[in-house]
């Protein structure tokens, strides 16, 4: 995007606004970092204001829903960056957020090429419409070495190949991938490459995904190091259906978040083999009336809070669970919440003050101490 390319000091001719146009970019500094926020929703914004962000570690651009297609005539996305690479490397940029714009694929991927020379570690794209088809990367092209990539309400013209195309512009060290409100998660698995370092995948807030969609999204053998999977509000209906999808994907999962799904009874369904290392499961806010059958054998952390349980789980139902959260279930109203559970299981009946605002993924990573 022109505003991003401008930030990275590319040799572009920027559109200059009149002197009366207010500056769209502002700096905010504290003891920890320098942040820069730019609002380019004005009909004729001063794009050159983006240079103000050159000294910031945390940068956010808001496009106001405008289309950036006109920039295709002004920006050479394949320009030689040789004399600018050292300048780009010197920028302190670590986190970048881009919101609300209509962006041609060539501009987006050209920007990722520029960011490949920066120290960017976290990228968030939100409320974007990515238009047009993608070109193959140049032989010497490489994208940023991201640790975290977050996509929310991003639509792509290439509905089933967008992940594979985006993946070509990222270095292979991505550890956390979040995709929310996606328009398509039906990936072309033959084209998707392996994510060799991905440890956390968050597909929450995709209510149309469902268990069949999960099978399509979790391309087999593409996530060999996946440890945490978050599926909050993702249209899941049964724990057995999720188990089948995980078995097909062959992921070494350790923590699974199924909270905020309407789960139903799976009694009588065929047994399923969960990932052998799965030991943490979040089933809060799922409407359960009793403990589901066929839970992971090595489950040690279980969140059943804010369901419809009318009794305590029996010890034989959860033989390996050492940390159990039951906050907000009906049976607690008729019992003393301080009553000891004679099986020795540690029961959490209230959330810690600091945990309420944490994401489900982070809560799972922290194990039994925090739950959403």
Curated annotation (Swiss-Prot):
Query: What SUPFAM superfamilies is this protein classified in?
Result: RNI-like (SSF52047)
Q: List the disulfide bonds.
A: 25-38, 36-53, 189-219, 243-272
Q: Which domain of life is it from?
A: Eukaryota
Q: Localized where?
A: Cell membrane; Secreted; Membrane raft; Golgi apparatus
| Residues where lipid is bound covalently (GPI-anchor amidated asparagine) | 342
Region feature Required for response to bacterial lipopolysaccharide (LPS), mapped onto this chain:
290-372
Q: Where are the LRR repeats?
A: 57-84, 85-120, 121-146, 147-174, 175-198, 199-226, 227-253, 254-278, 279-299, 300-321, 322-346
Q: Which GO terms describe its molecular function?
A: lipopolysaccharide binding; lipopolysaccharide immune receptor activity; lipoteichoic acid binding
Q: Which GO terms describe its biological process?
A: cell surface pattern recognition receptor signaling pathway; cellular response to diacyl bacterial lipopeptide; cellular response to lipopolysaccharide; cellular response to lipoteichoic acid; cellular response to triacyl bacterial lipopeptide; inflammatory response; innate immune response; positive regulation of cytokine production
- The entry annotates sugar attachment on 39, 46, 153, 186, 282
Q: What function does the entry list?
A: Coreceptor for bacterial lipopolysaccharide. In concert with LBP, binds to monomeric lipopolysaccharide and delivers it to the LY96/TLR4 complex, thereby mediating the innate immune response to bacterial lipopolysaccharide (LPS). Acts via MyD88, TIRAP and TRAF6, leading to NF-kappa-B activation, cytokine secretion and the inflammatory response.
Q: How does it assemble?
A: Belongs to the lipopolysaccharide (LPS) receptor, a multi-protein complex containing at least CD14, LY96 and TLR4. Interacts with LPS-bound LPB. Interacts with LPAR1. Interacts with the TLR2:TLR6 or TLR2:TLR1 heterodimers; upon interaction with ligands such as diacylated lipopeptides and triacylated lipopeptides, respectively. Interacts with MYO18A. Interacts with FSTL1.
Identification of the protein by name: Monocyte differentiation antigen CD14
Its gene? Cd14
